[in-house]
Amino acid sequence: MSSPEPITQREKKGNPSVAYVVTCDARLHYPDMALISALSVRESDPGACIQVVLDRESARTLRKMAHPLLEVCDHTLDVETPQGAEIFRNRWLKTQLPEWISGDVLYLDADTFVRRPVLPVFAHVSGFGAVANHNGKTLEEQVWSEDRRNELEMQWDAQYHTYVNGGVWCYRNSEPVRRLFAIWHDGWKKSVLTTGRLRDQPSLNRALYESGADVTVLPGAYNVQAGFIWQGMPDAVVWHFYENPVHLNNAFARLTAMARTADPGKLRRMVARVAKLSAPWSNPDMLASLLDRMQASGGAGSVYAREWLQGQRRHMLRHLLRGR
């Protein structure tokens, strides 16, 4: 399979790229999430060059329907991939990113939301940079049981000191980094064949250890992994969600649900509003900024404000009527 010509940074030469790898099925959930994430980058880093790598099947789908993600990004690249499910195609492209985009790159998973300027992250990095998985302080906190199972089945014994998350990372393009990606892609393919699972984090961490590339563990603020416990949210540069298209339990999910139906101007204003909140509240309406400050104050109205922001309007009204 021949490789396409890499995307170059023609319009914003010299700046690092912000990159997404987007694949989709009929639900279009991942392109919708990537749209919200890219709009947040437009707010945080207006000069960023946003580039999206697509497999051919997804590219045809998104172009046929004129998905707004294609308008928000600066460049897209369609790459022929082996046949497979959307996650397989995504990982196949992601683990070879320097093949598709030249220069220095910040990669973001689709389920991320950037709140503050993120490109200054490159001041920390000379090779490859990523944040500890789960924002954990110890390996026991960082390595998920499924990832450990994957490593055991592959008989990998990587002597890493930190196990990083594969959803937000950056690199300065160099020969050691390209070797890192070659090891990552090869390890991921072998892992898929051996285990039948598409997890890419075990092979990434193995590659970081084996490649000899300079690896920086970045400050946790560059990838605050939300999960179900919102810790470190106010100080985050990037919120990273484990998104479920069914459960609209935070602002990012609500924005995603309206990504293709909302007026573009209204959607941008909502993205800008959410970026200023201390947490991704599930009810980011026009009152959100005021109520966010109120709940943070710890004053008499803070409980009511928090309930409203969490979408618990009936609870709030009931508590008000009871004189709580």
Residue spans for each PLM region:
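Glycosyltransferase catalytic domains, chiefly GT-A lineage
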Residues: 2-324
